[in-house]
């Protein structure tokens, strides 16, 4: 069957959902850098020109996938923290525990971390102003939800929770990128063990970064 254009808003949304689902599935198989519009089109059985009827670019597809994945991850973080039952613990203990939970949950979503690491440098570069506005508005709503989770864990942060949340997301992408590069450099560490000082392990590095941001913000 040849391409049939969606005739209603519902059909158009269904086609968009199909494209986003295919992109999300591909991210489980390959890094963001390897995901091309050509391969995405092949996976959904459409010509590239037809995919571009629903999204203006590969980058817009991935921004949409990023936000959906982030939303689900924040819900997972909230549930994981609630299961810790540490509301009455001392502040230092809660900081370390929350950082550990965040690092564990985030590390379970490498596709999301890859998207976050590419957001500013790649994904926001080939989209229209309208697409950026939609993404930023959705990101603002997501940050508000994340801030609520952070506040439940560390109420002492008060109005600084959104700032901490934003820094946590930025650090997540950066630490992931370093951890991936470190993994690829493992052979160099074997040649010269002294270079292993540059090895970055995702979970402990992310936990340390998040705990430092929270503690540092409270100390300012």
What are the language-model segments listed below?
Residues 73, 92-114, 196-220:
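N-terminal hydrophobic signal/anchor transmembrane helix of membrane proteins
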Residues 14, 18-25, 43, 60-83, ...:
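Alpha-helical structural segments
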Residues 1-31, 38-42, 85-87:
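Basic, helix-initiating cap at the start of DNA-binding domains
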Residues 33-60, 64:
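Helix-turn-helix
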Residues 144-152, 156, 174-220:
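C-terminal peripheral helix-coil segments that are non-catalytic and often amphipathic
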Residues 106-130, 183-188:
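Amphipathic alpha-helical segments used for helix-helix packing
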Residues 64, 79-112, 164-168:
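Hydrophobic alpha-helical connector segments
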Residues 123-154, 162, 204:
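Amphipathic alpha-helical packing segments from all-alpha helical-bundle domains
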């Amino acid at each position: 069957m040849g391409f049939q254009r969606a005739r209603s808003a519902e059909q158009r949304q269904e086609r968009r959902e199909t494209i986003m689902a295919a992109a999300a599935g591909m991210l489980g198989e390959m890094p963001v850098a390897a995901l091309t519009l050509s391969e995405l089109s092949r996976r959904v059985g459409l010509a590239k020109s037809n995919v571009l009827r629903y999204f203006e670019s590969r980058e817009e597809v991935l921004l949409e996938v990023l936000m959906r994945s982030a939303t689900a991850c924040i819900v997972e973080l909230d549930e994981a923290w609630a299961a810790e039952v540490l509301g009455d613990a001392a502040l230092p203990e809660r900081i370390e525990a929350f950082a550990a939970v965040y690092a564990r949950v985030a590390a379970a979503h490498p596709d999301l971390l890859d998207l976050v690491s590419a957001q500013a440098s790649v994904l926001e570069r080939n989209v229209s102003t309208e697409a950026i506005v939609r993404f930023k508005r959705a990101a603002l709503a997501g940050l508000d939800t994340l801030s609520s989770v952070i506040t439940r864990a560390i109420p002492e942060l008060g109005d600084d929770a959104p700032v901490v949340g934003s820094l946590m997301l930025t650090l997540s992408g950066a630490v992931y990128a370093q951890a991936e590069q470190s993994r690829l450099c493992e052979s160099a560490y074997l040649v010269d063990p002294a270079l292993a000082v540059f090895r970055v392990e995702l979970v402990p590095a992310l936990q340390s970064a998040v705990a430092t941001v929270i503690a540092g913000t409270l100390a300012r």
